[in-house]
Structure formats: C-alpha cells, structure tokens
A protein has these predicted regions:
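A metal-dependent hydrolase signature that marks the N-terminal structural subdomain at the beginning
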Residues: 38-40, 83, 90-160
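Active-site recognition of the HExxH zinc-binding catalytic motif
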Residues: 132, 198-214, 244, 248
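Long amphipathic alpha-helical segments used for membrane anchoring, targeting, substrate engagement
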Residues: 32-109
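Catalytic zinc-binding patch centered on the HExxH motif and its immediate surroundings
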Residues: 153-180
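Short helix/loop segments within enzyme catalytic domains
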Residues: 115-143, 233-234, 238-281
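Short pre-active-site segment immediately N-terminal to the catalytic Zn-binding motif
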Residues: 183-201, 231-235
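Pan-zinc metallopeptidase signature
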Residues: 275-325
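Catalytic Zn2+-binding segment of zinc metalloproteases
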Residues: 207-222, 252-255
Length: 325
C-alpha cells in the first residue's frame, strides 16, 4: 500500500455559513449536530494540548512502545509501504537506539484550536474519560485522565518521535494520545470510513489503551516474549481487540444517553473494519499473512467493538481469556 501524505492546510474557524450539516451549531444553544452524533461544545476536555504548527525536537524511538490504530508505516523511495506489522511493546524499545526527551507543552489548549474537528475531539475526549471515571468508581478504583495532543506531521513523545503516517497512537510512558487531525481525511477518503462517530471511535480506541495501562494489562503484554507479539492469536492482537471492545463500552454509554443517531454505530464498525490487518495487507500486497498480524482482522475488530457495545462491561472484553477471537 502506498500511503501518501495529504496536503495539510492549517485548520481554522469554520465558515459562517455552511451548506451541509457537519459541525452546524444550533442557533439557540451550543449543541452541535454533525449529520450524526449529537455533541455539546460546552462539554469539552481541558486535557487537550494543541501542538499544531510546532517543530518537534529530533529524537529516536525509545521508552515504552506506542500503541496505535494502524500498523507501522515507513517511507521508502516509491512511497509509503508497510514494512513491519507491529506497534510498540518492549522489543521495540531500542530499535533505533537512544532515549527520548519528552517535550512538555506550555499551554493546555491554544486559541488556534478553535475549529470544528478540534472541538469535536475535545468533546469526545471529555465524554470518554467521564465514562471511564464512572466505571472505575463503580469498582472502587480511581481513573487517571490522559492528555490528548493535537499535532501536525510529526511530534516528540516520551516514547520517541511520532509521525502522522503511523496514525493516531497512545504513548504509555507519558499517558498521552497523539492525533494528527488529517488522519480523519485519510480514514474517510482512503479507508472509506466516513462519519463523525467513526472519528469518535478513533479517540475511544486510544483511550482504551490508557485504560489498559491503568488496569495493568499493558505491562503484562509488554513483558510477553517476542514470539507472542505477532500473529492472529498473539498478545498484541488481543490487546488491540480489547481496546476496540473498550471503545464499544463507551459507545454503549453514549447510546444510553441518547447522543447517537441512526447509523452512528455502523460508522464505528466501519472504521474498526477499515484498519483490520487483513484489509491493510490485501491493499498493500494483494495477500494476507495472519502470522504477521498485530491488530486483528477487520471482522474481529468489528466483532469486539460490538461485544463491548452490547455488554458494556470490562469482563466482557477479556480477549486474553477468549479461545476464539
């Protein structure tokens, strides 16, 4: 698969008048209707860090591995190609040598973030973390909130240098989710996963990885042997499918609160399927090799999201105990 970069214009304020309903503000309130999910701009997370337009410090991959939505992509002379179908975990810690120095943002949210995509991400982050705060509290635990960093093209993390080509990802070392908003254009145009709830699924999946860290699941997988981190039944695949299931738990919560419209769940299922290992491999090479999977097939990713949506419990998302994925 050739994964070309999109032209990246800076996102700013939306035009005053729009012909479609995406991001349209209700004239009487701050509630927005985006041809799907109902969301409120008065309920946005303060844990969003806008680093778009900044030049990251150079660094090599180090620390705990990133956990992302897509297999790792690297650029060669003839375009973007999949060279390794794995993201993160211990054996990548010294892949390129050296450590990483985390760059701490000096502001929580910048004024430049006053655009519809950023507002929507901030709302979804707030809602997902409020949901997990309640779930943890119900079991006597305290949920520790993650930060979400908006960046352009590349960024520096405690896990090393991050790049937009890898798609959205979560860094366990700094407990931050990283998103280049242009990925949503790729998700819609290249992968065919359109709609605002497809975009919301991306955030919910990455927050699912943050939940895994707090439950101690990430550490157990990180210590798994190298041979257990690739393949259709691997710990890597089970970790990713569980994050999909956790995203489904959040989706169930939004449905119970009447935030969803008809077709929203289908959008999320479509997004989960679009980034299945089998589908990406087939696009890249015309062949499917389950032995190199790290995220699960399209059908598995959709199935586990739906399982979380249908059951709404952490116990239902135990992919590690499942005999069949």
């Amino acid at each position: 698969m050739r994964f070309h970069r999109l032209a990246r214009a800076k996102l700013g304020h939306p035009p005053a008048a729009q012909d479609d309903t995406r991001g349209r503000r209700n004239r009487w309130s701050n509630v927005c209707y985006s041809a799907g999910m109902r969301w409120d701009q008065d309920h946005e997370s303060s844990d969003v860090v806008d680093e778009r337009g900044r030049s990251p410090q150079g660094a090599q991959l180090g620390g705990a591995g990133i956990l992302g939505l897509l297999p790792l992509l690297l650029r060669f002379r003839f375009g973007w190609v999949i060279v390794v179908l794995v993201l993160g975990f211990g054996f990548l810690r010294n892949f390129m040598g050296g450590g990483a120095t985390q760059r701490v943002a000096d502001t929580a949210v910048t004024a430049r973030g006053a655009d519809v995509p950023a507002h929507f991400v901030a709302f979804v982050l707030d809602d997902t973390q409020a949901t997990w705060t309640r779930i943890f509290a119900d079991s006597g635990k305290t949920y520790r909130k993650a930060k979400l960093v908006l960046f352009s093209d590349s960024t520096q993390t405690a896990c090393g240098a991050g790049d937009a080509a890898t798609g959205p990802f979560y860094c366990p070392s700094d407990e931050r989710v990283y998103i280049d908003l242009s990925f949503y254009q790729e998700l819609a145009n290249r992968f065919g996963a359109k709609g605002d709830f497809a975009e919301a699924y991306v955030v919910a999946h990455e927050i699912g990885h943050h939940v895994q860290k707090q439950l101690g699941i990430t550490a157990r997988v990180d210590h798994a042997s190298r041979s257990q981190q690739q393949g259709a039944e691997s710990s890597s695949v089970r970790l990713e499918l569980q994050a999909d299931c956790f995203a489904g738990i959040w989706a169930r919560s939004t449905d119970q609160r009447k935030l969803l419209e008809a077709g929203d769940v289908d959008e999320a299922l479509g997004a989960a399927s679009a980034v299945g290992d089998d589908r990406l491999q087939r696009q890249a090479t015309g062949k499917v090799n389950p032995e190199t999977w790290t995220h699960g097939s399209a059908a598995e990713r959709a199935r586990w999201f739906k399982k979380g949506f249908d059951n709404g419990t952490i116990a239902a998302c135990d992919t590690f105990a499942a005999t069949s994925l």
